[in-house]
Design a protein with these regions (language model features):
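Bacterial N-terminal signal peptides
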Residues: 7-17
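Positively charged n-region of N-terminal signal peptides that target proteins for export
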Residues: 1-5
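Carbohydrate-interacting regions of secretory-pathway proteins
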Residues: 19-223
């Protein structure tokens, strides 16, 4: 017990040190305080969100059942920073200005064949969907650290959203929408994490696979 306590004491400062200066942690590494599972079934209703050793784990509670986890608080203009370490074959995402159903500007964490990490997608915005549904699909592979933690940072600001994305501090995306395509023209919303649903026709999650998140923090921007 003493050895475990010592190990956790040594790990905790390392986790805190990964939160950038000027950012406020919104995940305490202990439980899901400040977050909630979506009350809708739009993305699924998986309860497979748990916390272990300072890491937020996402896995389907039954094969194919996805879901989203949202902050209780809504944000307007902000920058969010987090570390991600997904299993290969698992499709996830970081939602910006999300509503309860998960309609949002999405920064993709689609870690699977043909997927995108750091790309921008209009989740639930029919006016934005093209053949691939991707608004921006950057060249991310050369900046990705395989089987390791990767720092993802995203910034959204303006009534007409201007979105920037960095992967391991390398700029990937600097994009401004042509108009505000959010549902109802929303200019604020929740931050959300996604585990994608999966089926035989749309295999988006490796059975038993995980997405892992830690050091989630936000910096609210002045208007």
């Amino acid at each position: 017990m003493k050895l475990r306590a010592l190990s956790l004491a040594l790990v905790a400062p390392l986790l805190l040190a990964a939160v950038p200066a000027g950012f406020t942690p919104i995940f305490d590494g202990k439980d899901l305080a400040g977050w909630h599972v979506s009350q809708t079934n739009h993305h699924g209703n998986s309860k497979g969100w748990t916390v272990k050793d300072g890491v937020l784990l996402a896995t389907q509670d039954r094969p194919g059942n996805g879901g989203i986890l949202l902050t209780d608080k809504k944000y307007r203009d902000f920058e969010v920073s987090l570390e991600v370490n997904p299993d290969w074959g698992c499709d996830g995402g970081l939602f910006l200005r999300s509503n309860e159903a998960g309609d949002a500007y999405q920064v993709m964490i689609d870690y699977l064949p043909g997927g995108s990490v750091g790309g921008v997608y209009g989740e639930g915005f029919e006016a934005l969907k093209d053949g691939k549904g991707q608004l921006v699909n950057p060249d991310w592979q050369k900046h990705w650290k395989k089987d390791d933690w990767n720092l993802l940072r995203a910034r959204i600001e303006g009534d007409v959203p201007h979105i920037r994305v960095w992967l391991n501090e390398v700029p990937l995306v600097d994009w401004t929408d042509s108009a505000n395509h959010a549902k109802g023209g929303a200019t604020e919303g929740m931050i959300a994490l996604q585990m994608h649903f999966s089926n035989q026709q749309t295999p988006r999650w490796k059975p038993g696979g995980f997405h892992r998140f830690r050091n989630i923090a936000v910096k609210e921007l002045p208007r």
